[in-house]
């Protein structure tokens, strides 16, 4: 069901989108190239006692190599299989890189909730693979088959500036795969993150500033999720295959999320295409754009829920959501009658304003129609058209017809079934594209 807008609204929408397109505040990624770092010094972990026999521990050799190359140089893990049974933590490095061309296999013995691989502090850092086959295999199924989900996380970036992680595969983490905790001027791209079919196995959770993300996630929880104190993110060319879906939240008190663009997001067989989730709280979420979303077989599509029942209520009148644009969404929802494809529920005491929905084509797979359900907000579709103080209200509208020129292509790599939790997950190949008809911004390493 598509609703037309006036020329004034369309012009305003383009102005909003164009301003957000440029919202990265500067360059992202390392300040020096891998070639320049290698020219300073190269530390091969095999020279520090590592062996690609998947028996000898590689953790301490990586740590020792960082001692020599962490202040300028390249740490190289050659092709092969390596056993990782020690936490690897690198702190305050500068002008350094890890070239992971082999596969690190996590030993399931440590069960603490720490990080398998952590990069904290410092700047000009890079973790990558030169052939797109380098991987960290988390052996999560060894925990999950015993119903253990309080266990290690995989990759952690904290307090680092001018960094990148790319052309790397993260597989079967015991808990969340990739956490970016206060990273700045960073980029994660050309990655395949592949986890089990269970909650808590997040793809990427991030907060910080000036970050660019483009990659694929397979799991059953967060795909790429922005947290409190997130600013100036460009999250584009995202492939959730399948996943819990992308989100902002969950959000609590002292929330400040601004200048976030999700663009070219393809969501297959997931919980939602996009969710903003909180239950009470205080703060501000503004200048947000969700542009060019394609979805198929998803339980929910757009879900802004200010009373999300999966989190405990937090003190406060609610978060102020304003200047949020949802533009050009196509695809299908499983059952538009029982799960409204558009669901916008704002706080009763803090109505949303400037919520703009344009060109929404979400068709029903089961049932007779799509139901759009909105409450306490102004904008389009089922949102109130008022621009002044809103009184409490709810509205429901219906539809199930596509606009002229409707297109919602699928992807060749869409998984027919999700991975379970009790068997090993094979290391996937990074896909050739993360969104229909769009080539990666940078060519996948090793591709012709």
Curated annotation (Swiss-Prot):
**Keyword annotations for this protein?**
Carbohydrate metabolism, Cell wall biogenesis/degradation, Disulfide bond, Glycoprotein, Glycosidase, Hydrolase, Polysaccharide degradation, Secreted, Signal
The subcellular location is: Secreted
Known EC number(s)?
Answer: 3.2.1.-
Q: Which cysteines are joined by disulfide bonds?
A: 43-69, 223-240, 346-352, 374-382
According to its UniProt entry, one GO biological process term is:
polysaccharide catabolic process
- Signal peptide (residue range): 1-22
Checking InterPro entries in the record gives: Glyco_hydro_28, Pectin_lyas_fold, Pectin_lyase_fold/virulence
Q: Name one GO molecular function term.
A: rhamnogalacturonan alpha-L-rhamnopyranosyl-(1->4)-alpha-D-galactopyranosyluronide lyase activity
Q: Which residues are glycosylated?
A: 54, 92, 131, 256, 284, 323, 328
| Record carries keyword Cell wall biogenesis/degradation | yes
One GO cellular component term of this record is: extracellular region
Q: Which residues form the active site?
A: 221, 296
Q: What does this protein do?
A: Pectinolytic enzymes consist of four classes of enzymes: pectine lyase, polygalacturonase, pectin methylesterase and rhamnogalacturonase. Hydrolyzes alpha-D-galacturonopyranosyl-(1,2)-alpha-L-rhamnopyranosyl linkages in the backbone of the hairy regions of pectins.
Family classification = Belongs to the glycosyl hydrolase 28 family.
Task: From the Swiss-Prot or TrEMBL record, give the protein name.
Answer: Probable rhamnogalacturonase E
Q: Which organism is it from?
A: Aspergillus niger (strain ATCC MYA-4892 / CBS 513.88 / FGSC A1513)
Q: What is the lineage of its organism?
A: Eukaryota, Fungi, Dikarya, Ascomycota, Pezizomycotina
């Amino acid at each position: 069901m598509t609703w037309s807008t006036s020329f004034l609204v369309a012009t305003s929408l383009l102005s909003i989108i164009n301003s957000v397109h440029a919202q990265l505040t500067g360059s992202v990624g390392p300040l020096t190239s891998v070639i320049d770092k290698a020219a300073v010094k190269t530390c091969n972990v095999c020279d520090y006692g590592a062996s690609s026999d998947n028996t000898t521990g590689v953790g301490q050799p990586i740590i020792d190599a960082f001692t020599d190359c962490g202040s300028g140089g390249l740490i190289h893990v050659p092709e092969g299989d390596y056993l990782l049974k020690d936490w690897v933590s690198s702190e305050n490095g500068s002008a350094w890189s890890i070239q992971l061309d082999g596969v690190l296999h996590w030993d399931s013995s440590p069960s603490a909730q720490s990080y398998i691989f952590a990069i904290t502090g410092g700047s000009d850092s890079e973790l990558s693979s030169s052939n797109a086959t380098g991987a960290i295999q988390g052996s999560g199924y060894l925990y999950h088959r015993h119903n253990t989900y309080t266990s290690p996380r995989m990759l952690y970036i904290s307090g680092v500036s001018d960094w990148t992680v790319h052309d790397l595969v993260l597989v079967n983490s015991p808990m969340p795969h990739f956490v970016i905790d206060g990273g700045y001027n960073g980029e994660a791209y050309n990655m395949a993150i592949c986890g089990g079919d269970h909650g808590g196995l997040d793809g990427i959770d991030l907060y910080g500033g000036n970050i660019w993300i483009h990659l694929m996630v397979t799991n059953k929880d967060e795909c790429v999720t922005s947290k409190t104190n997130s600013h100036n993110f460009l999250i584009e060319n995202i492939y959730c295959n399948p996943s819990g879906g992308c989100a902002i939240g969950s959000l609590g008190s002292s929330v400040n999320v601004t200048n976030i663009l999700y663009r070219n997001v393809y969501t297959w067989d997931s919980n939602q295409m996009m969710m903003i989730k909180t239950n009470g709280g205080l703060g501000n979420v503004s200048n947000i754009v969700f542009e060019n979303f394609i979805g198929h077989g998803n339980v929910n599509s757009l879900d802004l829920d200010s009373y999300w029942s999966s989190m405990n209520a937090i003190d406060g009148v609610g978060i102020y959501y304003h200047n949020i644009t949802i533009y050009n969404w196509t695809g299908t929802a499983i059952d538009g009658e029982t799960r409204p494809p558009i669901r916008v529920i704002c706080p009763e005491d803090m109505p949303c304003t400037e919520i703009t929905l344009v060109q929404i084509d979400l068709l029903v797979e089961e049932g007779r129609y799509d139901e759009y359900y909105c409450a306490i907000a102004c904008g389009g579709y089922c949102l109130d058209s008022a621009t002044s103080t809103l009184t409490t209200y709810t509205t429901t509208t219906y539809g199930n017809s596509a606009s002229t020129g409707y297109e919602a292509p699928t992807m060749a790599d869409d998984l027919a079934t999700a991975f379970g939790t009790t068997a090993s997950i094979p290391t996937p190949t990074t896909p050739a594209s993360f969104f229909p008809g769009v080539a990666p911004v940078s060519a996948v390493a090793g591709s012709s």
